[in-house]
Amino acid sequence: YIIVLGAQVRKDGPSPVLKYRLDKAVEYLNENPDTVCIVSGGQGSNEPWSEAEGMARYLQEKGIDTARILPEDKSQTTEQNITNSKKLMKEGASVGIVTNNFHVFRALQIAKKYGLSDVCGIAADSTPKYLPNNMLREFFAEMKWLL
């Protein structure tokens, strides 16, 4: 399995952060044709539909077979992404977490906390001009999670 962690979707498609994640997922899925992809993310107040639905549409448009895509459309946080996605997987399955490079460290910590022992990070790029802001936000999210 791979789990693509959600980020904002818009009427015109995924946000830049999410597009990086989805493009990395497409690359991985094309290289690993037996892998099932869980797209994980609920609907925020500023989103036209759930992140999972938007991600599934994008992957389908890029040629990924619908049978390989499992939507998880309730999550609002990274912890919920992991715990809700885990319920869709076979016990003891190996999993890759697809997220942006600045988010991999915390996502893997959370995954291990919730019992995903055979887990690895699949790092997508991020927009360089936003990287300082993203790193700062991630630092505070990490501190909050640790406390």
Name each model-derived stretch:
Residues L131-L147:
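A transmembrane-helix-recognition feature enriched in membrane-embedded lipid enzymes
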